[in-house]
Amino acid sequence: MPEKKGSADAKVLHCSFCNKSQHEVRKLIAGPSVFICDECIDLCNDIIREEAQATARAAIRSELPTPAEIKTFLDQYVIGQTSPKRMLAVAVYNHYKRIRHGEIKGDEVELSKSNIMLIGPTGSGKTLLAQTLARMLNVPFVMADATTLTEAGYVGEDVENIIQKLLQNCNYDVEKAQRAIIYIDEIDKISRKSDNPSITRDVSGEGVQQALLKLIEGTVASVPPQGGRKHPNQDFVQVDTTNILFIVGGAFDGLEKVIRDRTEKSGIGFSAAVRAKSERGVGELFSEAEPEDLIKFGLIPELVGRLPVVATLDELDEAALVQILTEPKNALVKQFQKLFAMEGAELDVRPDALKAISRKALKRKTGARGLRSILEGALLDTMYDLPSQGNVSRVVLEANAVEGDGKPLLIYADESEAASGEKAGRGEVRDAAA
């Protein structure tokens, strides 16, 4: 006679790992001739998580460079800006040392996080500094634009979208994401319009600053899995931002006037000291920035207090722009020389052309960001014709081509072209317009 289901003699299933019966655990999952309970699954997850954390801690211990090594690495990619580099190197070193220190149990002293604010004119290297730091430290890096952020519930991106982008960059490895660097650009564009508290709601200005406070200081952010929308009944990915280093940057156009008004008050009447407005440059004025200046500019005091390290970048002059064109590892001239080498031609950018490019960028007031468009414009016609001309061995760029008064010179490798060039007068050099 077959056994009745649920009778006392029915077969009781046991976990193949801990041997607990199905009545002692909440869930028993069946596989091919084996079973595993929910308690063993939790234990396996804990073991995997501990191993991942140990790997991440070992990576931080073994790869933490000294401030001098960080600055040396930054020097290879970013020209000038010595003081900001030193400040960044020390702040980043102390941040990751703090993470290591926090893992030591039983220590009474807790080290607070030192987030960084970069202030400098457009094209001075703020974004490049943050990107280079992340590349050196081999940590996840994400860049966000503050101008697209709004308060939660309004059309636009809320601040938690930044953490969502970070998780996507890390393939949803939460442990790795919690040691990342986040760079928020254009932070000055979310300043409030007045230094007095606003009565009406400012969802893209002061409201965003309020939303960023806890994220920057350290909180557990709930992010929808795989970038989905938020639903009440779904499980969220929990990301602790306590050990994430936040770097914010902005051009702060108009801050120099706030600083000048504070530092150059000289009274009235015959005893007043008369000073020229243009005595000091923007970079020099930025170096004297105080928290009160940033608050008057439009940042709320709470946000300024959570960004204790303020590094100011100098304006780039002509000499610095020439260095940027030629000296860094990924210098612009080196990039174009590699492009021309792929076509079998050598690119020679003369010193007077480098100076002409730098002067043009200074007139545009775009800093180093405008160098590529100027160089691209000067070489555009040549790059268009070069693939069709297989006998060009060298391209010479001079100042007149940059200024629009001529074309780059082409030197041909073909002997017949050289011979015809000699009849015309001067060797094998021909104008690109020919």
Curated annotation (Swiss-Prot):
Coiled coil stretches, renumbered = none
Entry's Gene3D superfamilies? Answer: 1.10.8.60, ClpX chaperone, C4-type zinc finger domain, P-loop containing nucleotide triphosphate hydrolases
SMART domains membership: AAA (SM00382), ClpB_D2-small (SM01086), zf-C4_ClpX (SM00994)
One Pfam family named in its UniProt record: zf-C4_ClpX
SUPFAM superfamilies, per database record: Glucocorticoid receptor-like (DNA-binding domain) (SSF57716), P-loop containing nucleoside triphosphate hydrolases (SSF52540)
Listed binding positions for Zn(2+) are: C15, C18, C37, C40
CDD domains per the UniProt record, alphabetical: RecA-like_ClpX
**InterPro entries named among the record's database cross-references:** AAA+_ATPase, ATP-dep_Clp_protease_ClpX, ATPase_AAA_core, Clp_ATPase_C, Clp_protease_ATP-bd_su_ClpX, ClpX_bact, P-loop_NTPase, Znf_CppX_C4
One MF term in the entry's GO annotations: zinc ion binding
Question: Which annotated residues bind ATP?
Answer: P121, T122, G123, S124, G125, K126, T127, L128
- List the GO biological process terms: cell division; proteolysis involved in protein catabolic process
Q: Which cellular component, as a GO term, is one annotated location?
A: HslUV protease complex
Keywords of this entry: ATP-binding, Chaperone, Metal-binding, Nucleotide-binding, Zinc
User: In this protein, which residues make up the domain named ClpX-type ZB?
Assistant: 3-56
Say which domain of life the source belongs to: Bacteria
Spell out the subunit comment. Component of the ClpX-ClpP complex. Forms a hexameric ring that, in the presence of ATP, binds to fourteen ClpP subunits assembled into a disk-like structure with a central cavity, resembling the structure of eukaryotic proteasomes.
What function is annotated for this protein?
ATP-dependent specificity component of the Clp protease. It directs the protease to specific substrates. Can perform chaperone functions in the absence of ClpP.
Describe the family membership recorded for this protein in Swiss-Prot or TrEMBL.
Belongs to the ClpX chaperone family.
Q: Mind telling me which PANTHER family this protein's record contains?
A: ATP-DEPENDENT CLP PROTEASE ATP-BINDING SUBUNIT CLPX-LIKE, MITOCHONDRIAL (PTHR48102:SF7), ATP-DEPENDENT CLP PROTEASE ATP-BINDING SUBUNIT CLPX-LIKE, MITOCHONDRIAL-RELATED (PTHR48102)
Q: What is this protein called?
A: ATP-dependent Clp protease ATP-binding subunit ClpX
List the source organism.
Answer: Bordetella parapertussis (strain 12822 / ATCC BAA-587 / NCTC 13253)
Gene from which the chain derives: clpX
